[in-house]
Regions:
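Hydrophobic, gly/ala-rich membrane-insertion helices/peptides used by toxins and envelope proteins
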Residues: 1-23
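A generic structural motif
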Residues: 156-166
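Surface-exposed polar/charged interaction patches
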Residues: 7, 11, 15, 53-56, ...
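Secretion-targeting segments and adjacent low-complexity export tracts
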Residues: 78-82
C-alpha cells in the first residue's frame, strides 16, 4: 500500500482499506425520480442527464464549464456537493477493490476543493458526495466498497449519500 495504483488513485500509507475484513452491509439508499433508461446512455451523457434532472437533490446548480470538481452549492444551507454516477454492471466494478478505488479517485476532487470563484470556505461547512447507482442489488464486494468509501469520506470531512435511479 502507498504505491501508486494503476488507475492513478494514490493512497497514503496507513490508508489501506483492509478489504477482506470489511463486513458487507446492504447500504441504505434514496431513490431519485430519474428513469432507469439513463443507464443505456454513454457515461458522459448519463452523468449530464442525471445532474440536470429537475426536482432531485443531485441537480447541478453550478456551471459545468467553470466548476469541474463540484456541481452543487447551497449558500443558505452552507454546503457543496459532487455527484458521481457509476454503472455497477461494468465488469471492472465487479471487483470491489477496483470499484472502491474508482469511487475514492473521484471523491478526491471534492476532498481537495476549497475555493473557486465566489465559493470560499467561509460559505460552506459541509461537503456531500452523491453517489448514484442503478436500482439493483449490489454484490458483496460492491457492498464492502460502499462501506469502505463511506468510512473514507467520513475521515476526510465528506458525507457520502447513496442514491439510485428508478
Amino acid at each position: 500500500a502507498g504505491a501508486a495504483l494503476e488507475d492513478g488513485a494514490e493512497e497514503k500509507p496507513g490508508e489501506e482499506d483492509n478489504f477482506d475484513n470489511i463486513t458487507p452491509v446492504v447500504p441504505a439508499s434514496n431513490k431519485l425520480n430519474i428513469p432507469a433508461s439513463v443507464w443505456d446512455k454513454s457515461t458522459k451523457e448519463r452523468g449530464e442527464e442525471i445532474s440536470n434532472y429537475d426536482n432531485t437533490v443531485v441537480k447541478r446548480n453550478l456551471d459545468s464549464s467553470e466548476f469541474k470538481d463540484i456541481s452543487i452549492f447551497s449558500e443558505s444551507e452552507k454546503y457543496i456537493a459532487r455527484t458521481h454516477s457509476m454503472d455497477t454492471d461494468m465488469i471492472e466494478y465487479q471487483d470491489g477493490s477496483k470499484f472502491l478505488r474508482a469511487i475514492k479517485k473521484d471523491m478526491k476532487r471534492l476532498e481537495g476543493f476549497s475555493k473557486q470563484g465566489n465559493i470560499t470556505p467561509d460559505k460552506y461547512n459541509k461537503k456531500y458526495y452523491y453517489l448514484v447507482l442503478k436500482n439493483k442489488e449490489l454484490s458483496v464486494d460492491q457492498q464492502k466498497a460502499i462501506v469502505a468509501a463511506t468510512e473514507y469520506a467520513s475521515r476526510n470531512g465528506i458525507v457520502l449519500k447513496l442514491y439510485t435511479t428508478e
